[in-house]
């Protein structure tokens, strides 16, 4: 019998739930959809100029950049209101893990 850790929990990415999943560490994987042969494959993270972890994902057949911290917060904490932002508690923009994120007011 295998016991899953909390890091092994994968939730759908709200923008494209049939194609991508995200875990608590900020990893994204393919969950089917466009290319079933890639199902389960963890996507390669990239970093933007400010140090945020980003992913290139396909939404409605168009490639889009998405921030890992926002995908994690949206999946595990719920939708992010327009007047709120996702804060990295430790100040490390390269750490998109759920334990490091909180939704706060702008400003």
What role is predicted for each listed range?
Residues 1-86, 90-107:
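Conserved recognition-core residues within compact binding domains
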């Amino acid at each position: 019998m295998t016991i899953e850790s909390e890091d092994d929990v994968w939730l759908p990415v709200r923008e494209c739930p049939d194609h991508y999943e995200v875990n608590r560490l900020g990893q994204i994987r393919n969950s089917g959809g466009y290319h079933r042969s890639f199902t389960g494959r963890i996507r390669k993270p990239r970093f933007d100029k400010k140090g945020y972890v980003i992913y290139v994902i396909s939404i409605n057949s168009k490639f889009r950049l998405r921030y890992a911290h926002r995908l994690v917060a949206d999946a595990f904490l719920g939708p992010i209101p327009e007047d709120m932002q996702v804060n990295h508690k430790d100040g490390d923009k390269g750490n998109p893990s759920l334990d490091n994120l909180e939704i706060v007011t702008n400003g």
